[in-house]
């Protein structure tokens, strides 16, 4: 790479950062950081722990954006200074390092822009992820368990904490249903890309004739809310609370007492289970939190449907609306039908490497909103 080309790239990066800064409302973010940090020094700050944690999370999110931008800005200035030194005295090793830094910088800007896409009202929240197999018995239940492992691996790779809140094993293999609570900054913002029907095509290990089978599993993702984030009133007469023994993956008993909780909301038919804690009280609190989140999500979806009717739009619902196909046979391919993102590295995807699919979906939704 010639020095003139290096300079063009650096100037382009500087212009990109200037455009990003213009869209960030930078001064307002820095003012908010100052206000949050003043709140954190108040003597009664920890009196309400949920509210305090919410302030800390919001402050950390803002600082991540502001500090991330400053780091990129400083790196551009460092590259400019190195380029100016090379103008005075050409050093092959220094030039080679600068070339690599210029090439690597594009990926850093792309990742920063991706972070900025997660600006939805609940993107920063933890995520509640549910998997349900489609028709097909053992085949689809096994597929649901493969997706479970994929999301567990993805969560670990992202540094998220993944908890199994509810688990109902399949009769022979796999799972009939499973609920994960995925904790971490922007967990919902990323994982909302996974909501929909996932399709598997493979030679079935359960078919002695070695025939090819197609299986489906649905993934539902909603944000976890703090109690003060949403206003959802639940009439005690509208719910039934049942207790049962908790059991985990593989059938092992987590607790021999009836600490697990099932809450049924009769007006909507929504059922939530929680068996993650040893305490029945804590499981009930967590289950009520999940129920409120589901009712809030239902309310949002009803509003979206009303708007779609006004606009004359129709959305497909059901097993025909697959978002992604995972083909193991007769060839290896994972393809997202919304963005056309695809890869032949099926094993890597099943090991949790779904980042490219999530990133392409986030950019796709940004482009859709711009249009």
UniProtKB/Swiss-Prot annotation:
The modification N5-methylglutamine is found at residue 252. Keywords: Cytoplasm, Methylation, Protein biosynthesis. One of its GO terms (molecular function) is translation release factor activity, codon specific. It is found in: Cytoplasm. It comes from Staphylococcus haemolyticus (strain JCSC1435). Peptide chain release factor 2 directs the termination of translation in response to the peptide chain termination codons UGA and UAA. InterPro entries: PCRF, Pep_chain_release_fac_I, Pep_chain_release_fac_I_sf, PrfB. This is Peptide chain release factor 2. GO terms for biological process: viral translational frameshifting. The keyword Nucleotide-binding does not apply. Methylated by PrmC. Methylation increases the termination efficiency of RF2. Transmembrane segments: none annotated. The gene is prfB. Belongs to the prokaryotic/mitochondrial release factor family. It holds the Pfam family RF-1. The keyword Protein biosynthesis applies. NCBIfam families: prfB. The gene for this protein contains a UGA in-frame termination codon after Leu-24; a naturally occurring frameshift enables complete translation of RF-2. This provides a mechanism for the protein to regulate its own production. HAMAP family: Rel_fac_2 (MF_00094). GO terms for cellular component: cytoplasm.
